[in-house]
Amino acid sequence: VLAGGGHTHALLLQMWLMQPRLRPAHTLVTLVSRHSTALYSGTVPALVAGLLERSACGIDLWRLCGLAGVTFVRSEITGLDSQARELHLEGRPPLRFDRLSLDVGAVTAETGAGSAASGAGAQPVKPLEPFLDWLARPSPGAVVRIRGGGAAAVELALALKARGFVPRLLLRGEGLQLGSAAANRLGEWLLAEAAIGLERRAAASAAADLACTGSRAPRWLAAAGLPVDGATGRVLTDASLQVRDYSGVFAAGDCGLIAAAPRPASGVWAVRAAPVLAANLQRSIEQPEAPLRPWRPQRWALQLLGDGGWRPGGPRAVAFWGPLALGPSHWLWRWKAGIDRRFLERFANQASMAPAAMACRGCAAKLSAGPLEGALARLEGAAVCQVPAQGPAADSVAAPPPVVAPTPEDAAVVATAADGALLLQSVDGFPALVADPWLNARLTTLHACSDLWASGASVESVQALVTLPEAEPALQEELLLQTLSGVRSVLDPLGARLIGGHTLEGRDGAGLALGLTVNGRAAPGRHWPKGPLHPGDVLMLCGPLGSGVLFAAAMAGAARPEWIDAALERMQRSQAPLVELLAAYGCRACTDITGFGLLGHLGEMLGAGGPGLGSGALERQGFQEVDAGHEGGTEVACAWAAVAGAADARPVCTGRSAGAGAAGDGGAMRPLVVTLDTAAIGALPGALELLEQGWASTLAPANGRALALLQGPIHLVSAGRPTALKALLIDPQTCGPLLAALPAERAGSALAAVHRAGFAEAALIGRVQEGPWPLPIRPA
């Protein structure tokens, strides 16, 4: 387990990617970080000054881990049990390890007495992410008081000057603390040139806005019993980076300190520690009896500080090396900027090493609609053909019930309880969408439960089928624990139970996969089928689309980490609260948008039993009508089936509705038309951009057959980006949103209630009407 996404660990992964022989053989490696982007500290002052964008200052840990074959776990580390060899994480079970490497960075050593404005403590500069969020609050021209007098405080003050603030430094002593007399003199000259005031011997109670007072390691390291430096809390190691008296535990970067050669926290030493850490992790696993490689870091590290470019002529920099100080000059800035750029390019250029197009996972790994429905149609036909004739009385023998339901529903009704409630069951599952087994199980469970929520049911129990990769028994135990804990993380808040299951060991390199059988109950009168839709119904989509294309691009290293973070945050939101809300506002048909995309699942709703796609509509669209022989029947069941002689599959009406037509229509039913407002259909961040670039899930081409509906019962009111929006309509979803049909007069109130419940991205996207012409979307 690599705890933390610091510079040493990032370089370690890059080394493993470029030189796989350096990676310990037959080892599952997991990296844990609170953020999916590791900010490179050397570029942060330029970011504060406005010289760089935030996207240019980070290392994409999602992509780096994926390319290096490392499991990425995004979580806050809360503690360490060194005896049980477990790393404790926030809100999820601990991770057990055989080897542990600590590179968790540092936090600001102290925060001062408080802000003059609010009385709250000064904002620490470390961790960097909360500080950068704070940076957006003050208005340009505001006075920003910074407690601190080291190199970081000086560079930050100059960057804030360039940003338009009025910084002041609060010094604990009489002067700066830049490591040498020459550096202190040059630092004071830079600050005086920028008219940045110094408050010498500032009282500890003096109000400050920012704290930049040095760093110390997170306190949970000392709480775990590890040996630490008393002043900084950094974990004490020997020359091999192994923690003193703790075999198999290593520490590097700002949280580690070689006891025999202490050096201040600096990115220079963090970078140079990476080859040593790589060698010793490999040696400790593959050659546990061999001595570890020692390292003695250089005595001094070059420091290059930028002035933020506050004055005309462009940014400058100064250089400190031991007792020497040089600058300021523009060429020193160009040198510094080049060093930083080349460091980050080592990681950005790894995108070219992404594998060629790979089959998508999650719900995009499901079978496409064509072969699925073809097999079911043949199964039904085979069952009918196998009914034996019984002589002259055979004509009077009742036909057997259908092998499969004529209209596929999200969940099957298996029984009716004594109180009239319906007992429902559904099954779902797929190969792991993400490498983190706990998160993958959580996503799979939410995805499976949505079939019951779309049917108006609550979830009561689940059984699991877990396929584990071939591995050592202890590792399989850990993977199974993490998987079942992820399932429980969804079920426990619902009051549902994991009542059983089965395990398999995969063969031929098969990875982790999870399937779930989900059981639930729908209150009397609440069961929602997929249809029929009724004229006047308004369609509510309860969330954004785009997970398919995002994870397809992520597999190739083309999705930005913040896009994946946003998608996973949305996908982990339980839709259970929507059941009561939609019921209260008269929901009468519902489905969840999953593998076949919005168009495919809306097509199922249109084809569901009742006056959905009337025969007249089908004939005008060139679809084949089949008389199922139910004379006088009032139910029309339309399903996707193969049309004889056609290369593709089209909707086929398998029944006829009698007496439902309007006057002058010859008794034929009027067709239903759905008008979709594409401007109202939400997209996850990054989804439309990727679709415009040509990215698509591997299931999307098969889903493309649903685009034929746009030539028939579904009309689009298009906004801009028509190509991307059409592609979004067939994008397969994992943990996709519910799509509900509501009475027009209650749809607006229902939407407001859904927004209040936390589903801010829900929208009214369509309206159902009779007739072939596009109609207004939103109810009056």
Locate predicted features:
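Beta1-alpha1 glycine-rich phosphate/pyrophosphate-binding loop at the start
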Residues: 1-71, 116, 146, 151-181
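FAD-binding core/adjacent interface of flavoenzyme oxidoreductases
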Residues: 67-147, 210
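A Rossmann-like FAD-binding core segment of flavoenzymes
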Residues: 72-80, 95, 162-239
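Residue-level recognition of short, solvent-exposed, well-ordered loop/turn junctions
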Residues: 96, 139, 272, 528, ...
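FAD-site-proximal beta/loop scaffold in flavoenzymes
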Residues: 118-141, 206-272
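A conserved FAD-binding loop/helix module that cradles the flavin
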Residues: 255-285, 290-308
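C-terminal auxiliary extensions adjacent to catalytic cores
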Residues: 309-354
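Helix-biased detector of long, well-ordered alpha-helical tracts
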Residues: 353-780
